[in-house]
């Protein structure tokens, strides 16, 4: 079978290349990590060199967040005698393991709650395994304890002797086998030790359309007051990768919210927060499904679940 020929080129060992069922049936395979196209030169051409009527790859997508993996979509080309309606698609897809998430909060943690609820309902292919906070009695920490999620105090403070140092925090998150770090209203600057340990795996949500109204001092209601005072007609949440500075990492997703003529900061904040809850869950779903891809110019994109050639 042509599909078996393709898979055997990825998985030369018989244990990694199981028998594939009828091509009209969907199938899922575990592939070894593919770190670059150069590892598999035959992938550099869309036509894999099989004769007419064989399977030809039509899409290759490199996943660059945490563990590298590939998804391959194949279609059976028609011979000169084949009827068009006999064409069909075959999809060989990497099996994605369930991800482990660490969430950082400083307050009530409404975004944290939305993510946790999505995980419990099954719409999110990951679990919040640990909560990190700089305020041990904040609402987010209380919610975590009530739901059996371990709570870690960071950073270490004079009045909080149980707090961790940056290196201790990195070691602790590694013990929890954390895949992604999600900042959800966490007001402390993330230490460089953590950024280096979890490269391209730390995300933050900010209540404005970055790069506008971001940076040190722009948080909470201060952001919405500044947006209204500026006369801006639109605002909305931004989710971005975290670097060594406040709100300067690569933008991953945004959602536009109109600023109404007579808006108060509280009214605008409520509408933006509603969009935050939806957007963060959608982005974390994409992270857990390994649907983040990188453009050649370094811009991250979220791949559509339904169509790998479309981006959200």
From Swiss-Prot:
Group of enzyme by EC: transferase
Keyword Chloroplast: yes
Classification via Pfam families: Formyl_trans_N
Residues engaged in binding N(1)-(5-phospho-beta-D-ribosyl)glycinamide: 109-111, 276
InterPro entries given in the database record: Formyl_transf_N, Formyl_transf_N_sf, GART, GART_AS
EC number(s) on file: 2.1.2.2
Gene Ontology annotations for the cellular component aspect, listed alphabetically: chloroplast
Keyword Chloroplast in record: yes
Signal peptide: none
Biological pathway: Purine metabolism; IMP biosynthesis via de novo pathway; N(2)-formyl-N(1)-(5-phospho-D-ribosyl)glycinamide from N(1)-(5-phospho-D-ribosyl)glycinamide (10-formyl THF route): step 1/1
Listed GO biological process terms: 'de novo' IMP biosynthetic process
Residue span of the annotated presequence: 1-73
Site features described as Raises pKa of active site His, chain residue numbers: 247
Domain of life per record: Eukaryota
GO molecular function: phosphoribosylglycinamide formyltransferase activity
Family: Belongs to the GART family.
PANTHER family xref list: PHOSPHORIBOSYLGLYCINAMIDE FORMYLTRANSFERASE
Protein name, as recorded: Phosphoribosylglycinamide formyltransferase, chloroplastic
Source taxonomy: Eukaryota, Viridiplantae, Streptophyta, Embryophyta, Tracheophyta
